[in-house]
């Protein structure tokens, strides 16, 4: 079915649907619809989940208000999807500590700022982040930042075929190696868990990582626990034989049993030849246990969480499925192409 069927044009010519298709990229149209908060100054309790579709907006608002507000700002992020706020999301149970604390916290907040009752909330540190893996809360005075460490992609050139071919190292390899994989729009890499699919959360994804249209880069087993908190960025030196292509980046914990559970991901559509491709992943707070490893998985699709890129460069809503192209992508690492992950490491 076409994105602009004649019947919608005839029966709903003034529908916002047409505006959405016309403004399929960030523009002034969307800026005008965004809430104007520059004159807002109120105490706020910001609530989010690591697998919440809207987490980026929650964190952005908290950072904005915390930087200029004269009123207290508090942020709490648990191992949750958008709703409900419970101890289990996806395939994992995060324990009793993850059980919903929000209702009680809201009452304390309202009692303090609406009734003037001293509930002790102003004596607490303003940021509460649930550390997955350790399954307990961590407190911060400000959003973790400036704590990034680079881990570089390295490969034998067979990262699409062998799970031991792509690795993650603390130093960039001297020589450049290319990994090549092929995106088929008729059998796209499926979405599984994360923050953009339903059901959300951490899922066992080793079967997906075995596909030949997925590149995997895995660290060595850790000799000590690794603690992450904050924003994660992936920079990939990637080219393709199409006008446009997508990249999906997923970070997972690889347990010593061989099972693989995702904990954050990001997605980007590339319409230019700019290198490296920068992918901002969902923020996270995660402990990867000693003896386990962590992995980056790269693919050119994550369907149906994101629509398949036809590779034609046609505007969203105008591309036809029949015109979708098979796309060959090349990821380069090492030498002059330092593909890397910027991890937010905390003590």
Task: Enumerate the language-model features and the residues they cover.
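Active-site-proximal cap/loop segments of hydrolase catalytic domains
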Residues: 1-121
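Glycine/threonine-rich phosphate-binding loop and adjacent beta-strand/alpha-helix elements that clamp
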Residues: 92, 102, 114-347
